[in-house]
């Protein structure tokens, strides 16, 4: 599951994207049950402890956008492993919960190069060495709110670690877009998982985190 390979070929196919977003909605309902069961798993499976990770990577921020809840659950697993601060990116105008409506709006925003206004109050990002950026794959890349954020705040010199939920299109072209949006940052090895499998991804997340060579960006 751990890969930053460019898998954009075919990632814009509407059937793949719609399948991504349809399964994300189903995964939200399934996750209510599976997430409860996952909470019973011994947290000791995480090989990375928060204090050790922060010692290697300096101050850590986990910044994520989640529509159906899958990416939020993945962010929580990462937070358990590395500690730091966790912030959910939200927009002034919330996205609709209706599946067809959010699919159409996400596509429209991408075509129009929209930059949705953000309602999230962010801390001074200069104080962080490592920023985890989490998102669902929408139409082959990051949701447009992240374009708003990353065109506003400079992350030069920082470690950026992408993590992504999807239902078949993996990272799409999102990692390439991150490199364009953050040309002065260090993009580290990311983690991608199907949204429907997030609840069972704890061991994979732990293995991925243990393999990250987090070092101070200074």
Regions found by a protein language model. Give the residues of each.
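N-terminal secretory signal peptides
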Residues: 1-23
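N-terminal export signals
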Residues: 14, 20-21, 27-49
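C-terminal segment of N-terminal export signals and the immediately downstream linker at the start
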Residues: 44-76
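Cofactor-binding loop segments of dinucleotide-utilizing enzymes, especially the Rossmann-like FAD-
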Residues: 65-67, 89-91, 165-167
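A short beta-strand-loop structural module common to alpha/beta enzyme folds
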Residues: 84-96
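Short beta-strand elements in bilobed, periplasmic/extracellular small-molecule ligand-binding domains
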Residues: 86, 186-192
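Helix-loop-strand module that forms the ligand-binding subsite of alpha/beta enzymes
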Residues: 94, 102-186
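Glycine-rich phosphate/pyrophosphate-binding loop and the adjoining helix
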Residues: 193-218
């Amino acid at each position: 599951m751990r890969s930053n390979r460019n898998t954009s070929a075919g990632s814009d196919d509407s059937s793949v994207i719609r399948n991504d977003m349809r399964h994300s909605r189903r995964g939200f309902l399934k996750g209510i049950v599976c997430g409860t069961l996952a909470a019973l798993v011994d947290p000791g499976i995480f090989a990375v402890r928060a204090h050790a990770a922060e010692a290697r990577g300096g101050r850590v921020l986990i910044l994520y956008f989640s529509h159906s809840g899958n990416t939020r659950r993945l962010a929580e697993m990462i937070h358990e492993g590395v500690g730091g601060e966790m912030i959910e990116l939200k927009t002034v105008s919330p996205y609709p919960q209706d599946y067809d409506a959010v699919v159409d709006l996400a596509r429209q925003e991408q075509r129009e190069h929209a930059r949705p206004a953000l309602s999230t109050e962010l801390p001074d990002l200069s104080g962080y060495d490592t920023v985890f950026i989490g998102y669902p794959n929408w139409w082959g890349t990051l949701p447009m709110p992240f374009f708003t954020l990353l065109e506003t705040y400079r992350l030069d010199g920082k470690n950026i670690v992408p993590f992504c939920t999807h239902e078949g299109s993996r990272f799409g072209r999102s990692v390439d877009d991150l490199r364009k949006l953050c040309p002065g940052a260090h993009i580290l090895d990311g983690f991608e998982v199907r949204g429907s499998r997030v609840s069972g991804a704890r061991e994979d997340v732990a293995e991925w985190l243990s393999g990250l060579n987090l070092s101070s960006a200074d």
